[in-house]
């Protein structure tokens, strides 16, 4: 939030230095990130009047000017071609440091003294100006010679860049910051004159307003202004807007932006003649509707988007951006002003959906109270009247679902003291709260308060305790007796065991080329359908949030898959076609629904890849690496997860406890289609709580054998139901002490093998630590492998090398 010192002074008399003001705001919770002096590049720059221009004696393209700078006449040599005798211009004097980096000193140009320099707009850093912009800036002749240029251009303000916290939307305005300073300094807020003149006509004869969705639009106000004169705003208004980073457009648009910054109330202006039926309808959008907005982009409208419409079409995406089909233009004769309060969750959802965020959006997302439109409209009409910008039709249409009223609340002093750890005198509590506009009185242990509508963040003792301490001053804790801490036990901080496990595995995944992501642990109900979850299963039974921020985030997740697949889809849509992602997070399983006790929270690690070189065995290798340091024996079985490919996925099962540690494999093709991701997507998730409970394996160092190893390849034919894991486990047991390693390198299917049959080719390595293996010993081992495979798994030899 950007405010200026002079603007604040319209509401409160401040004699504190900018640095002191910044300190007060920062110490009370509104951190001032930067103080900018507008005149930082305008010091030693004054208004000058050119008295005489003569040709340079030694240069055809230079002229010598005698310039009145107020207290004296000085000489300046220039090559500018747009200056004339009698012109009023900005003159930078020795010692000036201009916006473009030029430092001004006395000098000579081709032998003639030049005691300063005329300035252009760029050299002064000016962005908005009445007059000639090419070459040297030509100023208004009414300006007095010697006047500091910062004063002449109304660029002598001090700008504060303030980081307003999310719970304080009332501070997203000049008046909001002024209220804070009033409480901090004890100086009263000045009463503002918001009066305006109207004609004798009735606004209802010009316009009708219908709010269909009062839940998403609890208040909508509209007024009509006739005989509008579209022109530049006066200099003071444009200077204010420029100082807070807003580009002036014209008087009507500038008024809406001025009210936005001054009172925090977003406003919009329509061209009355382009509103079909001279009617405004606030409703949900309809599928098939489209609107082209002020950024010249077109957006499809759907039923989840709140729109402001005329009788036939959307004219505004509510709370975000207006449409080109009804905006104020140079020929506008009659305008409609809008001031409204929209549901912040709805605005946030729509803003994310279309990818548009404006200053208005920022306010609505934090929350605009239901009283704000009334004050904003008054100020807008006051400015119309003050600037003579048009004729205001009598009356304001006001559709409001509930009358804005302050809240009567009670707070406990003893509970506040317990929260703060200190006792604040009752008279100080009353002084603080009353200065904040929270009219209060104390009776015994109870504070009776009347909380203003704009302080929607105050709900309980903790909130009021925060208000008291931030105004009382956190430095009070510096004087508290530290003796109770003298005998405190000091402990060494370290990661929780689960966090240690998560950190270890995350770093290993980084080594495999995985980027960590952080996703929401809440999701929409359509996840159940998109992930093919079956009703009344552990994954299907999700907890519904009582007060969701949006319909898209109304359930608590039972699997990490949805968030991961959504992130993959988002990356693919942005032409990122080859990547690996991981996430550590929690899933939540209710003991029963509806929820009667806290759910089970399970820490999970998930990772996924759309890399074209990754496959089932790549993931199997990664799993083996991640689990190699744990005392764990596990087996693989076909995965039962509905969103995994039934034939190219596996559950990891602890052989001792039969617990499922995790799952990995290819994502089900239907799920890939539902999320609009590649079919070549592989996904894995591991239960971090189970892994953390495992003992770490003690690694034993084995001597390298002095004798050569023997490699053999076998291909067998077996039933489709036989897994690779079963085959390799059988090979390992058959080899006994001679076993070193084994791996599958081919799986083959054909009609010749028979129905429901497959060929699996694998290699294995034999080694002895005592001697060189003989052919007889090798053949005996191979025969034992074939015999065990046949009798245990029904597999027969296809070929042997």
Label each residue range with its predicted role:
Residues 110, 114-125, 133-137, 150, ...:
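Mobile "lid/hinge" segments at catalytic clefts and subdomain interfaces of large enzymes
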Residues 47-77, 239, 250, 256-325:
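Conserved mixed alpha/beta core segments that line enzyme active sites in large multi-domain catalysts
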Residues 2, 19, 435-441, 448, ...:
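A carboxyl-terminal module marker
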Residues 39-43, 196-199, 490, 519-538, ...:
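Beta-rich nucleic-acid/ligand-interaction surfaces
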Residues 5, 63, 189-289:
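Glycine/proline-enriched, intrinsically flexible loops and inter-domain linkers
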Residues 1-201, 336, 353-355, 359, ...:
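Phosphate-backbone binding interfaces of nucleic-acid-interacting proteins
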Residues 176, 409-579, 712, 765-767, ...:
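Extended, well-folded interaction surfaces typified by the phenylalanyl-tRNA synthetase beta subunit core
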Residues 185-211, 388-416:
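Terminal amphipathic helices with adjacent charged low-complexity linkers/tails
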